[in-house]
Amino acid sequence: MQKCAGHAPLVTAASRVSQDTVDALLQAILKAYHKLASIDSHINDPVEIAFKLINSFKYLPISGSSVKDFESELRELDVFSPLLQSAVTAANNSNIIWDLIAVLFAYISIHKQLHPLILHNLNIWKDFMADNDEETATTTDGDSMNFGVLSLLSIVQNFEEITPNLFEFLKLGLRSTLLKIWVAQWQRYDPSATNLINGDEKISSWITKDYQVDFFIITSLASTSSLEVLPSHYFVYKISKRISHFPNLIDPKLYRSAISTIMENGISDNGGGENSSDKIDPTDLSFHLQVLMEVIDHPELNYLQENRLILLLDIALNYLILVPTHCLHSNFGELGSTQSLASTLNIIQFLLSKFLINMGSISQLINQYNRKCITTNNINNNNINNNGVINGSTNTTSTTTTTITNNNNNSNNSSISNNNRKIDWTQSYQTRYQIPYWFEDSILPPIPPISKSLFTFDKNLDHESDSIMIVNDVLRCLNLTILLISKLLRDYDDLKINPLIQSSDDHSNEDNHVIIEQYMQLYLVPLFTSLLLAQQLKDRGQERDEGHKEKEENINLIGSSSVKKLFSQLIFFSSLKLCENLVIKEKNLALYHLIKFATKVSLDDLILQKISINLLNHLFFHQIRDGSDDDNLIKKLCLKNQLSFQALKDYITLWNDGSEVYNAFYKELFYEEQPKIKPIKLTTSDLLKLFPEDVQFVISTPPNTITSASTSDNCTSSQSAAQKNIENFTTLSKYDVYSSTSFIPSTSKNTNTNVSKQQQQPQNSTPCSSNRFLFNKSSLISQESNGSNNNSGTQGPGSMNESYSLDNSFNTTNTNMTRQPTTLTRATDAMTTAPTTPIPYKNTSGSSNNNLWIESPMTNFKGSTISKSTNKSKMVNTGKNYILGGHNKVKNNSRAQSIHIDDFENENN
């Protein structure tokens, strides 16, 4: 067991099968090729045979067999003509057949012993393209994906079975890629050439294109199984990184060579001993598990700056998914981790999803603001040009004067615009994709600051990948993490392992329901975060398809809309399978907590509500089938359990909007007619009146909308210089300074001045720069404020907008995003959540001391009711009037605060 756990073999899942089985499978595939080549398309369907072929290829390992072993047998076989004829004659399913042909072509390409099927039939492709005028019919769409063969096969291998429904779901559109790229590459390929790379210049022209690198790997490198044919170490490392993504599709010898190259590229010059990074064993299971622990030890990392860590994580996940579960647990337990293996993987899933959501939201905000600036500049330029033409019609002198004046005004306007750009770029737009604040609190353990491990550093930083490549690697790691968690759940179910079983010595049965809820949240929180990411990718891709094309200057870190759509589908499908495996393992326990969790998150955000109902719809009506009959397994579980059934019915009844997505629940589960819903329109003020009075106090009606240009300008101009100085100062201070005046010694002469200045600003005014952090720890921008601007046109009740200051956002030394709630949707949430912007303290008593150290005005915002004025019983005069410049409103952090001591001192006073 120890040997298995410490050094699990670096092999693919298929190679664990005996060689006799592999030979038998290969002979069966060859017989299928003979049948496909001689088939009569009018009698038999070649498409059916092709689907069986590509599903068999998943179990055929990549071997080092020579091409000559099958040269004579495959020379005369034509397996593509029957399929091409079916694609031409098919009416509605032609795209599915083209995707099928492309996948079959890709599988043949990665097995070098089957290359004669392509090389001896190139004339067939040439004649077909000429007869069907494919030169003009397959022009490549600028926004489509140009797959490499390895990229395509790594996608389809995520699915247990390749079916027509899968191609209909993915809509890959591989016809253009097959005919214009892959076939053309093989037509230019010369297998007799010993060296296809004639210097750095030639390889540099195609090293950035994945489909070119994939073709080089499956042809030239497959013939040598060595990286020595490459002209320089730079290209060796670049192609090694590409090879590391596909352990099941590369010759094992070549894959091991690539992994060793990556491991040796660490900081070996810093160690010099036995523990230096060039001594890392790529087959050491403990090292790959340490990579997982490194990710959760540093949850605040910006993965765009951690190219090597993400690369090692990708390698580790590809390795771990092939290791037996008992070996994983045996070795992980010896590392002394405070987290279980399942907990570690779920935390990684959450961190990767959270990073991608926040990154996408930031890029979306920047793109929207850039478009706004471009539109504003165009309007200003048009106005200037129009004024110049009008003034120019008078005389030459006035024309010159007007031009100079307009240029000066334009320069001044540009200067003002640049000064305000950092301040209001986050005020004009609001992101739609918010992670509930309690997600992070419920899943991330408190982790003290820990230094990074040496193996995460890279001694050669000149070959860093670009941001788009790193983001794609993070997306791939996220999908692998979800697949690995699903695999563990399946193994736990097969082995009858129940982590919720308590030992006989544990008598805390009264807390059993709490443990169960925490266990379910361990899976459901990352699951819904990944589904939120999938929804974000889907929506962003649809925006581009509908004509909102992003201009060249805009930030786009994921790629075209096709790439976004594909990753969205992969993450959604993998998350759906994870949820299925969780329900299969835990039965009604998981189903009830899933419905309960969906009810909770739906009240937080309408996008999460949309995700929840789509997930439930797929689970109940489109997925798992019971083996005994055709009934849905989850449907049967729900009907047998009254708790789950009633929870589901309450949820559907609450959110039913009359749409088709709710109809199946009424028709197939509740056996009743779907109630007809009459839509109504409400203004924001009318909607707020439906809230309880204490919630209305927190969610006050804004005077203007946040998208108003005048509001933004007035907000910026009304902000005093003293207030800016205070905010810049507080980012470096340990004290929590609120809306206070600049440094004025607290004396009797200026006491009234201080109070009057505090009272000049209305309490309903919009806070311009009251927030010191751009990010929250779980959401891009905090959604809760007192008197903040509220965009009622796009957000539901409980989605609040708030203006932020960018110049102060990044001055903070705190690297963690602050944990703050993102929504206020229920009275209970409002009564336990403090708004970001405090209420200015007004001293109404002339005899009382105006220089009190008070707590945050909303410190006691946890009672059953909300006090609209500061509780004076908690104000304490410590006598420290000149600390931090004598600010009147700061937390007394200079000593430990005790409510009882403070009350006692006030009573004595």
Swiss-Prot record:
- Residues that the record marks as modified (Phosphoserine) are S856, S898
Region spans: Disordered: 746-824
Which superkingdom does the taxonomy of this entry point to? Eukaryota
Q: Name one GO cellular component term.
A: cytoplasm
Residue ranges annotated as compositionally biased, kind Low complexity, are: 785-799, 811-824
- Give the Polar residues compositional bias ranges: 746-784, 800-810
Q: Which GO terms describe its biological process?
A: meiotic cell cycle; positive regulation of transcription by RNA polymerase II
Q: Which UniProt keywords apply?
A: Cytoplasm, Nucleus, Phosphoprotein
**InterPro entries tied to this protein:** VIR1_yeast
Compartments annotated for it: namely: Cytoplasm; Nucleus, Nucleolus
* Gene ablation phenotype (knockout): Severely decreases N6-methyladenosine (m6A) levels following meiotic induction. Abnormal cell cycle arrest in meiotic interphase before premeiotic DNA replication. Increases the rate of degradation of KAR4, MUM2 and IME4 protein. Increases RME1 protein levels, and decreases IME1 transcript levels. Decreases RNA level of genes involved in translation and ribosome biogenesis, and early meiotic genes. Partially suppressed by disruption of RME1.
- Cross-referenced Pfam families: Vir1p
Instruction: Output the PANTHER family linked to this UniProt entry.
Output: MEDIATOR OF RNA POLYMERASE II TRANSCRIPTION SUBUNIT 25
Subunit (UniProt): Component of the MIS (mRNA N6-methyladenosine (m6A) methylation) complex, at least composed of IME4, KAR4, MUM2, SLZ1, and VIR1. Interacts with KAR4. Interacts with SLZ1. Interacts with MUM2. Interacts with IME4.
Remaining remarks: Present with 486 molecules/cell in log phase SD medium.
> What does the UniProt function comment say about this protein?
Component of the MIS complex, a complex that mediates N6-methyladenosine (m6A) methylation of meiotic mRNAs and is required for initiation of meiosis, progression through the meiotic divisions and sporulation. In the complex, performs a scaffolding role stabilizing the other complex members.
Q: Which family does it belong to?
A: Belongs to the vir family.
Question: What name does UniProt use for this protein?
Answer: Protein virilizer
The scientific name of the source species is Saccharomyces cerevisiae (strain ATCC 204508 / S288c)
